[in-house]
Regions:
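Conserved donor NDP-sugar-binding/catalytic core segment of glycosyltransferases
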Residues: 79, 83-119
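Non-catalytic N-terminal targeting/anchoring module and adjacent flexible stem/linker
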Residues: 34, 90, 246-440
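Short beta-strand-to-loop acidic/aromatic patch adjacent to the donor-nucleotide binding site
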Residues: 67-79
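Glycine-rich, basic loop-to-helix element that forms the pyrophosphate-binding segment
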Residues: 48-66
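Conserved nucleotide-sugar donor-binding catalytic segment
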Residues: 129-224, 228-239, 245-248, 253
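A conserved acidic beta->alpha catalytic loop
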Residues: 21-30, 52
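Short, acidic, metal-binding catalytic loop of nucleotide-sugar glycosyltransferases
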Residues: 2-14
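Acidic helix N-cap motif at the loop->helix transition within catalytic regions
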Residues: 26-34, 57, 83
C-alpha cells in the first residue's frame, strides 16, 4: 500500500484505495485499519466472507466512486514503481480510445536473506516503448493477468469476474475485453513488482495444482470460452487466441506441476486429455512451436493433440543443425561458461560435429554433458538418461569476447557474437535500475 500512497501523481487529490478484507487471518487486517484511520478520505476497507478472488473483486468494484476513470488491481505485498499512476494517467489522456493499460511485470522473490528481481517473459512487449497494441496484428503480445492491469471503469462496469472460477477469473475477463476492443496500451517506463515469498512458494504451488478444478473444469470454462468468443466475433479462432491458449497451457507440463497423476482419477485423467485434445484440434501446430519454452513441453502438447489418451509421446525429427537454447553463467573468479542446451532427443552429435567458441586467443570445443537420469513430464519419459543435455564451454577472463558456433561435416553455423564483460555490465545496470525503481 505504501507504494500507492507515495505515488508522484498526487495521492490525496487523485487516488482512491479500496481494501477488500475477505477473512484474512494474518496481520493485514490490522495494517488496513491503521491505513484507513490515517487516510480516511482516500482509503476504505470492505469486510466480506471469503468467497474467492472473483467475488472480492466484484464487491470491491461496487464501491468504486463514479468519478473514477481507471481501476487498477494490486495484491497486498505487491509494489508500484513511483511514477506508475502518473504515467498511466498520461497514457490514458493521450490515448482516449484505450480501455486497458498494462506495465512491465517483475517478480520480486523474497528468499529471506535476499530479494531477487526477475522480468516476466511477456515483458518483450515493452521493447518498442509505450504504444497501443493491436491484437490482430501482434498476436504474441498476449495479456491475461490482473496484477498491475488498469481498466477503464466505464468499460469495466459492463463486465464481471466469474465467481464460479477458482482459477483464471481474471484472464477470462481480460480476454473477453480484448476480443471486443482488439487493442490495449503498454506503458513501458514503469514497473509492477509481484511479491513471492520463496520460503512458502512450494506449499502454495502444491495447493494450487492439487485442486481438481484446475484441470478439466478450467479447460472448459476458460479455454473453451476463448474459442467460442473468437469464433462468434471473427468467424474463426484468431492467432491471438491460439497463441494465448498455447502459452498458458504449457504450465500443465512444467516439472513443478507434477500432480496430474496424483490429483486426478483414471477417469478424470482421460477426461482432461480428451478436452485438451479437442481444444488443441482448433490450434495450429505452429503456435505451439513458436512458444519460448523447452522442446519436450512442446512435444508433449503436440503428442496429446495428435494421439489423445493414453499418452503416446512422440519426439520431433532430428534436424541437420541441432535445436539449442543458449545461455551463459558468470563466475566470481572472472571466468564464464557458455551453454548450448540441446532441445532435441539426441544420444550423440553427428560425426565430425561440435559446438565451439572462437576468441582472439583460441578456438575451444564444447564438452558434451549427458543426462544422468530420465527427464519426465508427468510420469512419461521425454528424454531418456544418456541423451545429451547440454554442450558446455568454460572461458577464462581474457576469453570473454568472440563467436559461438556449431560446425558439422558440411558447414559452420554462427550462433551468437558474445561480449560477456559488456553483457554483465548491462545486466548489473538493469538490476540496479530496477532496485532503484522498487525502493523509491
Amino acid at each position: 500500500m505504501e507504494s500507492i500512497i507515495k505515488q508522484s501523481y498526487g495521492f490525496t487529490e487523485n487516488i482512491q484505495i479500496l481494501l477488500v478484507n475477505d477473512g484474512s487471518t494474518d496481520k493485514s487486517g490490522n495494517i488496513a485499519d491503521a491505513l484507513v484511520r490515517k487516510h480516511p478520505k482516500n482509503i476504505y476497507q470492505i469486510h466480506i466472507k471469503n468467497g474467492g478472488p472473483a467475488r472480492a473483486r466484484n464487491i470491491g468494484l461496487m464501491h468504486v466512486r463514479n468519478d473514477i476513470d481507471f481501476v487498477g488491481f494490486l495484491d497486498a505485498d505487491d509494489v508500484y514503481s513511483l511514477h506508475m499512476i502518473r504515467e498511466m494517467a498520461h497514457f490514458a489522456e493521450t490515448h482516449p480510445q484505450v480501455n486497458m493499460m498494462v506495465p512491465p511485470f517483475y517478480y520480486l522473490d523474497d528468499w529471506g536473506t535476499r530479494k531477487k528481481i526477475g522480468a516476466h517473459k511477456l515483458n518483450t512487449r515493452f521493447e518498442q516503448g509505450s504504444r497501443v497494441v493491436n491484437i490482430l496484428e501482434d498476436y504474441k503480445a498476449i495479456h491475461f493477468y490482473i496484477g498491475g492491469t488498469f481498466l477503464r471503469f466505464d468499460r469495466l462496469k459492463q463486465l464481471a469476474f466469474d465467481e464460479s472460477l477458482h482459477f483464471g477469473e481474471d484472464q477470462l475477463l481480460i480476454t473477453k475485453l480484448l476480443l471486443d476492443d482488439e487493442a490495449y496500451g503498454v506503458v513501458a517506463n514503469v514497473g509492477y513488482f509481484y511479491y513471492r515469498d520463496m520460503k512458502e512458494k512450494g506449499s502454495l504451488v502444491n495447493k494450487s495444482w492439487q485442486d481438481k478444478s484446475r484441470y478439466q473444469p478450467f479447460l472448459e470454462a476458460v479455454y473453451q470460452t476463448y474459442l467460442r468468443d473468437s469464433k462468434a466475433k471473427f468467424g474463426a479462432v484468431i492467432p491471438y487466441v491460439q497463441y494465448l491458449i498455447s502459452y498458458h497451457a504449457k504450465l500443465y507440463f512444467y516439472k513443478e506441476h507434477v500432480y496430474f497423476r496424483e490429483v486426478l482419477t483414471d477417469e478424470e485423467q482421460t477426461a482432461f486429455v480428451t478436452v485438451f485434445q479437442r481444444i488443441f484440434s482448433e490450434i495450429e501446430e505452429r503456435y505451439v512451436w513458436e512458444l519460448d519454452t523447452a522442446q519436450p513441453v512442446k512435444e508433449m502438447m503436440l503428442s496429446l493433440r495428435k494421439n489423445g489418451w493414453p499418452v503416446r509421446f512422440e519426439t520431433a525429427p532430428l534436424v541437420d543443425i541441432p535445436a539449442v537454447t543458449l545461455h551463459k553463467k558468470w563466475r566470481p573468479n572472472g571466468h564464464a561458461e557458455l551453454f548450448s542446451d540441446i532441445e532435441e532427443s539426441r544420444v550423440t552429435l553427428p560425426e565430425k560435429s561440435f559446438f565451439a567458441a572462437k576468441t582472439l586467443f583460441s578456438t575451444k570445443k564444447a564438452v558434451v554433458v549427458k543426462r544422468s537420469e530420465d527427464q519426465l513430464i508427468w510420469d512419461v519419459v521425454v528424454r531418456p538418461a544418456g541423451t545429451i543435455r547440454t554442450a558446455k564451454i568454460r572461458l577464462r577472463p581474457w576469453e570473454l569476447r568472440g563467436k559461438w558456433f556449431y560446425q558439422n561435416e558440411n558447414r559452420k553455423v554462427e550462433l551468437e557474437h558474445f561480449r560477456l564483460t559488456a553483457e554483465l555490465r548491462q545486466r548489473v545496470k538493469r538490476r540496479l535500475k530496477l532496485k532503484r525503481a522498487l525502493n523509491q
